[in-house]
């Protein structure tokens, strides 16, 4: 089987550098991986990054990236999301009922838009965007396997906030204290976003490190494996979010068979929440946040009721969610979701649009001279230092390096002096 299909993906450099720190980075990494494993009628797809060889390119990030306080563009003027000849797709996420006004012209200038759920698709259509928009439901990794809850000596709630006020850790804590304050048989862990890894601590030790009564807090950044362990060591996920671009956290909980209490509306997999959908209404966010339009506001009394009901009917909750866990995974594993999206794309545009361009000529690398002190490493592994000041980098990151003030373009004479030049020509 040969690589006879091609699909190009592109995003901002900070998304590529972040790897799995937050939603866009995690999604970009997984989409690239699983697009590379797509096969259509014995033709294997090759996922490439920002390549003019591909007739189609998806830019996976906010269409326009602005500082919301000053409304200044955070991308350099020469940054390009697509090549002119390409079929252009925006892959982006929305958490409210309206698209930012400064996104609209950009969204109307591409051929397709992919969003993570029907809620976001409706938001695009209700904002005056006329570009065809499709739902690209994301997926879950193989590591999120079922484990029946209710095996411990107490009931343990979990809330994961990723350092985002819209996930409403404040509402969860208020409800927990009202229902279970000082109850030795029930506890809760808040997994907050952190900036440091502490691998010497187990999940249980991290809980005790920041405990206050029956409330535990984790601030450290955890690996994927550690996050799975965290979910396994807790019984019920609480997630009264005001909106999600897709919603990885509740879906991961559901795939492990974890009873999950969450808001709906934004949620493509709401049917798997059973009777644990928090009642809600649309309204203005109660926190500052990256929103335009209205968001999903959880009803506090409904949250109280569902948390109490989950404890009162704990065994039934554990049985119900564990029984459906394999169905959740089978529908939402990453490869299935990516295969479906690419198959649907081929039906819309034709298989020829995923064939490499026959007259493609590779763009030569950009040669830069490092003028700083010490050393500097780029995201794709190129290292500059006092002994190797001149080297080549990918064209797509050269402009961002030139903006640092530490680099300038190499002259023809300088390029000719380095060994890599001769293999290049």
Where are these regions (language model features)?
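Extended catalytic core of nucleotide-activated donor transferases of GT-like folds
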Residues: 44-129, 226
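Aromatic "clamp/platform" in nucleotide-sugar-dependent glycosyltransferases that forms part
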Residues: 242
């Amino acid at each position: 089987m040969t690589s006879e299909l091609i699909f190009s993906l592109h995003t901002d450099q900070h998304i590529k550098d972040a790897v799995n720190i937050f939603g866009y980075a995690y999604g970009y990494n997984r989409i690239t991986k699983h697009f590379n494993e797509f096969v259509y009628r014995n033709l294997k797809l090759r996922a490439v990054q920002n390549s003019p060889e591909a007739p189609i390119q998806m830019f996976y990030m906010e269409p326009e990236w602005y500082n919301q306080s000053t409304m200044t563009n955070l991308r350099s003027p020469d940054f390009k999301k697509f090549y002119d000849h390409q079929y252009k797709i925006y892959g982006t996420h929305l958490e409210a009922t309206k698209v930012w006004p400064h996104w609209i012209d950009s969204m109307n200038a591409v051929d397709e838009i992919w969003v993570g759920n029907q809620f976001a698709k409706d938001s695009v259509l209700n904002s005056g965007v006329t570009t065809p928009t499709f739902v690209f439901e994301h997926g879950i990794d193989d590591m999120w396997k079922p484990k029946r809850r209710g095996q411990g000596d107490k009931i343990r709630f979990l809330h994961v906030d990723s350092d985002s006020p819209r996930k409403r850790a404040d509402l969860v804590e208020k409800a927990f204290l009202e229902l279970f304050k000082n109850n030795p048989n029930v506890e809760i862990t808040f997994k907050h976003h952190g900036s440091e890894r502490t691998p010497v601590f187990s999940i249980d030790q991290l809980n005790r490190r920041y405990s206050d009564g029956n409330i535990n807090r984790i601030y450290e950044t955890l690996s994927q494996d550690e996050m799975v362990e965290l979910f396994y060591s807790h019984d019920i996920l609480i997630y009264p979010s005001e909106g999600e671009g897709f919603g990885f956290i509740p879906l991961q909980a559901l795939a492990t068979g974890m009873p999950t209490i969450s808001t709906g509306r934004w949620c493509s997999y709401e049917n798997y929440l059973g009777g644990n959908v928090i009642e809600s209404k649309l309204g203005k966010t109660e926190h500052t946040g990256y929103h335009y339009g209205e968001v999903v506001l959880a009803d506090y009394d409904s949250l109280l009721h569902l948390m109490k009901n989950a404890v009162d009917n704990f065994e039934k909750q554990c049985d119900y969610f564990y029984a459906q866990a394999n169905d959740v995974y089978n529908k939402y594993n990453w490869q299935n979701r990516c295969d479906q999206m690419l198959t649907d794309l081929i039906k819309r545009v034709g298989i020829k649009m995923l064939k490499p361009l026959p007259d493609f000529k590779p763009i030569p690398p950009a040669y830069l001279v490092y003028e700083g002190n010490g050393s500097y490493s780029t995201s794709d592994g190129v290292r500059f230092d006092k002994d190797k000041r001149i080297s080549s980098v990918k064209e797509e990151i050269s402009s961002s390096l030139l903006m640092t003030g530490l680099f300038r373009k190499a002259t023809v004479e300088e390029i000719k002096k380095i060994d890599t030049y001769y293999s290049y020509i």
